[in-house]
Amino acid sequence: MASSVVVMPKPEFDPRMLQLLTEIYKREPAIRNEQDVYRYFAGFGQVDADLEDLLELMQELEKIRSQFEFGSNLQAARKKLPVALQEVLAVSENRASRQETNYANGYLSEFFYIYLPKAYSCEAKARVAIHVTEPYVKNASRVARALASCQATLHSFKVAGPAQAGRTDQIIAYLCSAEDLAVVEKGLTDSNTADCVGGVVPPAMKEVRPGLGFAEEPPNVPTSYVTVGGVTSKNLHKYDQKTHPLVKTDAGFAPKNNQRMSFGEFHAHRIWAGMVQWRDKYRGTSNQTIRFNWFLYEVYLAYGRKKVDLKTPYAFPARESTLADWRKEYFMNWKA
């Protein structure tokens, strides 16, 4: 569909975000909902990994958890790290049930959460994304230990399983205050982990230095999971517009409720809102470049037209522009 699109630099868009939106646009015919957008935004970065890698990572994280006496669990299964570790050990020793084997294979691509003491007394207000260099398991373990040493300040952190080693944010540290970024930097420096961090950071995050990205947490929006009667399950109503209606504000499209969503879900929320508007309004030229630029314009509006979003201004660090500006510069004065 978009093979003939000419992608021009735009001051409204960070180059990494423009690249992401270009890839999403190319896949637009297959995108059915916000969750599809999220999958592209998240950039899962799946790579080949085996249970030996997983077992080594889990054992190192368990050592850290035990040493510092932190809480921990697995993101999707919501199991405590020690329980999950026993399942993987059982699989490696060929004495596991089929269910345990399935769980263990699933852990390869999951996030492991480490809850620091402040996780129970403050709300995460910002995040630091860390891109870990190879060898992943060894270096991720070193970075995790460095973050654990910052327990007096940080909220929590999570470490991706070895099958997620291709992501740009394999480790994410959550901060109680944006000012605590300096604590993370110092912790990494004091722990001599310079060789463990490098490469690119996720779109929509400010690059502090190679391999280290920063952003404030998004505003309150629907959560992925809900807990009822002590049982945690997938929030099936998360994308139900009747349950979580969207409203148009000066800051773009926002839910009316007071819950939270992840950083990636927040941006998928905005991009999907722009795509919906583009699909609803667009009736026009066969010129693929103009079609693509109209899509970008609707995404730009969905983010709020200015620096896209007050909470995460790094996605679009540039100018505020109008439809007239876009017509002149990007639409070749074509009018819908």
Feature-to-residue mapping (PLM):
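Structured alpha/beta or helical-core interaction and ligand-binding surfaces enriched in interleaved
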Residues: 1-336
